[in-house]
Amino acid sequence: FAVLYLATYITTRFIKRGLKKFFEEDKKEMPKLPNKSISLILSIIVSMITSNMLIEKTMLALNGAYFGVNDPVFNVDIGYYMFQKPFIEALIIYFIGLMVLYTIYIAAYYIISFNKYFEKGIDPATLKKNTFVKQIITNIVLIILAVSAITIVKVQDVVCGKFLNLSNGISLYGAGLIDVTIKVWGYRIFAVIISVCAIMAIRNFKKENFKKVIGWLSTIPIYLIALFLVILIFDLVYINKNELDK
């Protein structure tokens, strides 16, 4: 709760600092805008919704155990997948959700303030240089980096996935040859590509170079298609040919 309150309070301070420039440009006295009250209310609501999930994952991680047996793919103790990994995933997902919420909050605060106090509208040039745009872009970059992080963590799920169904109905779980060779490194590279392409697209968007924005963003689906084709070809040519002998 304390962390949420502090984060909301600081975010609102930056919002008020950005709005102050519009009031100064319009030669208006800036009214007293809500901060402490709205920070308290938002923090209470978010804490009530998310506290149970975080407490459960935290207690699971703190009370975890090590089995002394490492998986052959990542050389990590089996206990990590049962106790620490769910906690790490929960933290990243929580962070993404929080950044999305704050992005909506920032946009809503500005829009409501603009509609209430600036009947004549605002200068687009001032808006582009304002803290508002910087806050939104910063949050988007943080969300992108968090998505990359969760992608890297989720790659480890190949160890627990189903990879073979036997004729007697029994399913075997673990990592197949494609999983440990192509998928692991393919998705690790994909996480890096997401970050680089998204950040470069944002930079070019700020420069209004929209052709490069499309170029950088199109790299992501192109890479996914290429990865799918590599997996398909590898499966047809190498795995299906004689998987048991490999």
Predicted regions: what is each one?
Residues 1-76, 85, 89-246:
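Contiguous transmembrane helix-bundle modules in multi-pass membrane proteins
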